[in-house]
């Protein structure tokens, strides 16, 4: 600093675990990794070698040769690769060889074969269906939904604003981790089921509630649209960075051969999430959809106390504690109202002379003072 030069210091205990400096220095130190036939994928101190071939023998020869080059490099620069932490995996659709293991050598030792390796937090499987990863993610979401339930009570529960912020931080951050990688999987419904439960907690709605209502009332875009937005964002970044490995895959993609596969570069057209959401809501055939003109805006009553917010949404979705619903669920023997008509949620607010609200469901949806007072009496 200035005219002074700092003295050399020998670090004997390496660097703290989890520090930013450690992977930065490692990347600088290993910036001249040797050329290999395999493609190298490096993130911090995780290095992955990936290659393609038409036979298992070719794969084994290529990877073993590349591992020998890496081992020589490590020995030259006083690095010691961990044989126990290094694994070999193979991805293919040939079911007859589903149990086939690769024989890849490193420093004279055969690497362990892992059929379901975890790389950067994503569990891979032989066919790259990501089913195992999505099962794990769904399990994590279920646990987090249980935590979110602690904030939900019929009388004292947190308001929708608090629940929405908590859900985005606690649940959606996990449910959408590396979403562009597995967004085209056939098993995304495993995650969607749990995210639907998250939105039910925010909106206070019941399980029979039509699914298109959940994102509208929770004021969160549908999971599929959020994943597509994440894919578009990644593709936009990859197109701008020519030094990214993904850039070449997008600008010069391999031939599209299998109809069961849906790679990211199959659909490069960016999507307007809000416009698509509005189109889907307009085409959705759900009860009382005429109440909502724009699904992307926060619906009236979002700041109401928990009990009134839940009750309001159950009238909106026509799924609540009316006798018609209770009879359908096996909780009541009769579906008749005290006025003699069949008691549905719309009957209670629109028609019933004992409980009707002046202006009906349209007035209730606006959640004005009269509507809130009516909800208090129900």
Question: Where in this protein do the model-derived segments appear?
Answer:
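Conserved pre-catalytic core of RNA-dependent polymerases
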Residues: 1-16
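Short Cys/His-based metal-binding microdomains
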Residues: 328-371
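Basic, alpha-helical interaction scaffolds
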Residues: 108-181
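Short, conserved micro-motifs composed of acidic
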Residues: 65, 79-115
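Helix/loop segments that flank and initiate small ligand/metal-binding modules
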Residues: 262-343
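Mobile genetic element proteins and their domesticated derivatives, centered on retroelements
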Residues: 18, 33, 45-47, 70, ...
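Active-site palm subdomain of RNA-directed nucleic acid polymerases
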Residues: 7, 23-54
């Amino acid at each position: 600093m200035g005219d002074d030069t700092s003295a050399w210091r020998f670090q004997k205990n390496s660097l703290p675990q989890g520090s930013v400096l450690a992977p930065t220095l490692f990347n600088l130190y290993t910036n001249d990794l040797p050329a290999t036939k395999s493609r190298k994928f490096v993130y911090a101190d995780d290095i992955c070698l990936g290659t393609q071939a038409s036979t298992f023998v070719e794969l084994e020869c290529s990877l073993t040769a590349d591992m020998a080059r890496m081992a020589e490099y490590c020995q030259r620069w006083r690095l010691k690769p961990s044989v126990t932490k290094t694994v070999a995996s193979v991805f293919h659709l040939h079911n007859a060889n589903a149990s086939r293991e690769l024989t890849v050598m490193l420093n004279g030792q055969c690497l362990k074969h892992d059929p379901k390796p975890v790389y950067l937090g994503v569990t891979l499987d032989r066919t790259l269906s990501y089913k195992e990863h999505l099962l794990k993610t769904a399990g994590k979401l279920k646990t987090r939904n249980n935590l979110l339930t602690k904030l939900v009570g019929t009388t004292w529960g947190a308001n929708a604003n608090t629940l929405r912020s908590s859900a985005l931080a606690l649940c959606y951050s996990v449910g959408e981790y590396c979403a562009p990688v597995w967004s085209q999987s056939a098993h995304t419904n495993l995650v969607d089921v749990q995210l639907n439960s998250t939105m039910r907690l925010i909106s206070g709605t019941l399980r029979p509630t039509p699914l298109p209502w959940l994102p509208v009332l929770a004021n969160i875009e549908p999971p599929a649209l959020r994943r597509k937005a994440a894919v578009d964002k990644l593709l936009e970044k990859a197109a701008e960075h020519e030094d990214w490995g993904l850039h070449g895959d997008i600008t010069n993609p391999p031939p599209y051969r299998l109809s069961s596969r849906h790679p990211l570069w199959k659909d490069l057209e960016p999507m307007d999430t809000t416009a698509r959401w509005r189109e889907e809501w307009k085409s959705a055939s759900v009860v009382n959809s005429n109440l909502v003109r724009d699904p992307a805006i926060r619906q009236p009553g979002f700041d109401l106390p928990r009990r009134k917010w839940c009750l309001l949404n159950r009238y909106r979705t026509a799924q609540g504690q009316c006798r018609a619903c209770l009879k359908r669920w096996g909780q009541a023997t009769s579906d008749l109202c005290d006025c003699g008509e069949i008691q549905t949620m719309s009957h209670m607010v629109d028609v019933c002379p004992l409980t009707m609200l002046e202006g009906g469901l349209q007035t209730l949806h606006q959640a004005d003072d009269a509507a809130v007072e009516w909800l208090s009496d129900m």
